[in-house]
Amino acid sequence: MALKARALYSFQGENKEEINLMENEELQLLSDVSLDGWLQGTNSRGQTGLFPASYVEIQSSRSGSVQVDYSGNAREYTDPPHQGSYDDDDEEDDDDWDDWDDGQTVVDEPSGSNGVSRSELQHHHHYSRPEYSHRPRPALERQDSIASGKRGSVVGRNLNRFSSFVRSGVEAFVLGDVPQFGGVAESHAIEMAPKGPQWKANPRPFNCSVEEPTKQTKFKGIKSYISYRLTPDHSNSPVYRRYKHFDWLYNRLLHKFTVISLPHLPEKQATGRFEEDFIQKRKRRLVLWMDHMTSHPVLSQYDGFQHFLGCQDEKQWKAGKRRAERDELVGASFLLTLQLPTEHQDLQDVEERVDVFKAFSKKMDESVLQLSSVVSELARKHLGGFRKEFQKLGAAFQGLSHSFQLDPPYSSEPLVGAISHTGRTYEAVGEMFAEQPKNDQFRFLDTLSLYQGLLSNFPDIIHLQKGAFAKVKDSQRMSDEGRMEQDEADGVRKRCRVVGFALQAEINHFHQRRLLDFKQAIQHYLKEQIIFYRRVSQELEKTLHLYDEL
């Protein structure tokens, strides 16, 4: 027998997968288990599709009705709310890192993602803890008005459950639904600078080297892996980490810092991962990744990162790893740790500033992609086409020298020797072209790859701010219409201000690093190009002198 439900509110579907509901309409449900707050069923007009679980009341065969909680499980509304604490046994214990499957590691992030969906999938249990669970309330009615009888309605929720604004929890933060934590020890200050808000500098800045990629084995050689020696200069105590350790840290960072553009880890490679070229490429990119991490005022002070860089004791490592995985100030809750400056900022000005950066980041992303494509093609020609052409030229000169020897009385040994040397010189120049990309083009491509990753994060981060702006406008409109208390609208505006300051601070840091990184990258590229062409010129000059001596 199909389950029945009654529509508590009217709902207008926005795509072909969603159906319309009318208030008090009788519905047939395919299941009473919701998926991300949505149910599937059939309305009185025979249309089958999705609709919000919070908009309906399920008719139970027993006395009373059934409502659906946020985790998607049907529950009698008369049951007391679950108050259990997080069950440690539910958490997968991966303390023995050497036994992890080498194939299970980070994958490339899709364009325009800061990893929110990845974090959601891999760490969903953090959001489903009882202390984070909130049964979805109707988008057109305020939760406190149901209990207290106050007039008015809350700002409508975004029903697109795939929106990063919803998934990240920032919508819940802006609407005041993220629980406060008493006695929060963690805090991150934002201060005003001449160019706008910026993260307060790390009072103990440091750098960390990435050196000595070494192939190691375990299980009597059955499994192999590469370890890297990391040496922070504030301790000068080296630690050794595998790529999967970086992967674990990266996932912690994704889970915690929703409004920060995280540098992407270099790609995972299943085959050829022990080849020297790949090992050196990954090392170069880990160096850039580490440099970006240590230069960021917030990321560099993250306890999980400090633990990653400094812990050498196995027991302490396990304790710190678990502590990082149980961190409650993650996602939208991280915004609770921010301390804002007292200076006033008009939200209209902030919105315009964000729009300017959005256009800038889009154009820069296109430019970086184009430059990366051109440099990659040039490197490919160095390795193949240029090398081959110079070898052909050298062989042609060698052929000419051999032909001059066919009539001995007129062969002129000095000239034959000079022509033969010319051929060998051009063959050597071809090898020089093939070796050159590792000195300049590959390193330049590493920087471009880093910024492709950073830029791909910003569309989702900007979307969070745009969503917050929309909630402010909605709340003020509802306050003007008398459907929301002004103090509630002010609260939405205040929390939107937090998101705005965080985004501007991140934009400020991005520009600071961009100016430094591209200055250094292009300087290095040009210097190496000059050295290269000087070497080519020197080889040609030596060959030229042979003809002067004839």
From Swiss-Prot:
Topology versus the membrane: Peripheral membrane protein
Domain SH3: 1-61
Keyword Transport part of the UniProt annotation: yes
Record flagged with keyword Cell division: yes
Location in the cell: Cytoplasm, Cytosol; Membrane; Cytoplasmic vesicle membrane
Any one of the GO CC terms: plasma membrane
Domain of life: Eukaryota
Keyword field: Cell cycle, Cell division, Cytoplasm, Cytoplasmic vesicle, Endocytosis, Membrane, Mitosis, Protein transport, SH3 domain, Transport
A GO biological-process term: intracellular protein transport
Pfam families: BAR_3_WASP_bdg, PX, SH3_9
BAR domain boundaries: 347-550
Disordered: annotated segments: 62-152
A GO term, aspect molecular function: phosphatidylinositol binding
Skewed-composition ranges (Basic and acidic residues): 128-144
Domain PX span(s) in chain numbering: 206-316
Compositional bias ranges of the Acidic residues kind: 86-102
Domain notes: The PX and BAR domains mediate association with membranes and are required for membrane tubulation.
Function of the molecule: Plays a role in the reorganization of the cytoskeleton, endocytosis and cellular vesicle trafficking, both during interphase and at the end of mitotic cell divisions. Required for efficient progress through mitosis and cytokinesis. Required for normal formation of the cleavage furrow at the end of mitosis. Modulates endocytosis of cell-surface proteins. Promotes membrane tubulation (in vitro). May promote the formation of macropinosomes.
Record family assignment: Belongs to the sorting nexin family.
Name listed for the protein in its UniProt record: Sorting nexin-33
Provenance organism: Xenopus laevis
